[in-house]
């Protein structure tokens, strides 16, 4: 394949116009593309193509041998420090195809970072750099082609200065085949074993970039947050999550509820495959200056068996969206540990909930779908939607940085290191690729060889980065390695003893004053002649503990690890302890402190530490008419992680419906009036008053006047009878008046005003009533005059028929 492509590139160089030092003109590129088929690989530099070096690599996340049709995979093109590249081209071809036709290409790429990568204008299926500048890593997503495509070859070309690195087999080519029934049991787990020695300790730092400024569409202002980070360092036999796989119950609870409890339980059940459980606090809100100054971090360790790390955290609120790393390999091919990993993250869907917006109601996905990265074309209501299909803006960045190495280091160097050094051209060996924006100290002297025997090892020198003037330009590593041979051969007896490395020094034998410490090594291989090894296997040296000894001194252990901070947010205290190994010789009390405490600072406390569901609809009004109350509720989706949840879970408000009907309301009936005639047949009446008029369709008022018949003595006939009745009536009135005058004289404290005039008749005909009143003028306070009260009289009027 390489032999066929080299003449193609030479023909391209020969046919084009004169080239500038750094690239082709756009016109030349267009002509070259049209002359050589649908999509030829066009390199943007001048020079001879060379085989790819091992410092450049093309990697599919998880290093799978098989792909699942339709699944998405993260593809990384990287350069090992201090190498770098300025330009690149990345394509995916069906095995055996040249790429001259559109149907030769397999699968589709998805841009992650538009500032780093773009599709080629003259070859839309290929990915290239956005701008020609120094870089050490680019990433894209590749979606596998449909069933029946067969094997696919991912190929990359690298441009560095005037030298073109191009390789069709090796580190810049990745062959991956379709998973069929025969390979269905094969997973996408990494298959390469780690050859590094000892353990390495790393710090994970998480920088959230999701904010209203970067992602304004439907941004949840009050409830935005990152859930607690959960993950582990693990072996290739355990998978926390992966693209194309199904979410476990633990992943589901992180994705939907932000709860890491079940996920941690699942991790701890894999005790043989897990070295460290990785945990970091949640962030409320998702972005603030504190998250940049003191970003959430966690430390973890890896070893030869458990050299992968995975983690995830929920982007909340959301249906089931997360970010994270899956099976990130921290072991290098040259049996070392990666110094630093920087990964930009975009959200992915756990496949357990079908919501499309941040605060969509719960809608379980049945059946459950596979984990996949979100895209800008998923749904028009999605906050990441882009009708043009652009890339999703990054929501977070994670940095993995090696902070310590422990245990034995490898006593060998891979054979290909000598080949790599010898293969470099002389001018490349001497050339310093250090950018002008990176200011270093001088190199330190070379260290002793890592091998203590007659084996191949390596030695190291270091320098210090004093200043980085341009943060966008990466600075090369501060360490340099060189192959060497160890001094482990014994010349005294003509035989060879193979020795191990020295074990770590023991603690000092005393807790005060001067003592000793020792270290050991062992014989890995005795001489063939059966003689004894004369190489020392133990070393002892003096050690001094600063504190002077006295008879009252006591022997104590080393300090233990610090306890966790007493506060989950804000300022708290942390403590560590040690124990007394031996009491003072003089029998006194040991004055050494066995507990030490100091302040610790956790992420800033926030007022919204819990995740709530959206408000429900308002209930019906509590009444059917008039004024009432209605309520709505919401649920606590996940427990508070930084304190109690003080948010209200129920709200109430007033509601108003049409006015209720008001029925007519009347007073009680009055007493019957006197008969309206002095003799013969007549009638009496009684009345009642309207207290409340009917309203809003209430019951109408019934009658307010009732009349009944009455009969007085028979009327006497003749002219003298009328005169007699009038006289009797007059005498009666005089008698009543005289009685009243006597009462007033006997009880002068009860005085009444004169009768008022009669009121107007209540009706014009048919019998009405008139009223008059006598009001009390002066009333005694004594209880024996309680009969002294206002008086009222009624009489009939307008009794003629209507």
UniProtKB/Swiss-Prot annotation:
Cystine connections: 39-123, 151-177, 194-331, 195-335, 197-410, 438-475, 449-484, 454-489, 497-533, 508-512, 543-549, 554-590, 565-569, 600-605, 610-645, 621-625, 655-660
SUPFAM superfamilies named among the record's database cross-references: TSP-1 type 1 repeat
Domain named Spondin: residues: 190-383
Any one GO BP annotation for this protein: cell adhesion
A UniProt-annotated Pfam family: TSP1_spondin
Glycosylation sites: 209, 676
Compartment list: Secreted, Extracellular space, Extracellular matrix
Domain Reelin as annotated: residue spans: 24-189
Residues in the signal sequence: 1-23
Record organism: Gallus gallus (Chicken)
An example Gene Ontology molecular-function term: metal ion binding
CDD domains: Reeler (cd08544)
Domain TSP type-1, residue spans: 437-490, 496-550, 553-606, 609-661, 663-716, 749-801
Listed InterPro entries: Reeler_dom, Reeler_sf, Spondin/Thrombospondin_T1, Spondin_N, Spondin_N_sf, TSP1_rpt, TSP1_rpt_sf, TSP1_spondin_dom
GO cellular component: extracellular matrix; extracellular region
Name of this protein: Spondin-1
Binding sites annotated in the UniProt record for Ca(2+): 320, 349, 353
The keyword Lyase appears for this protein: no
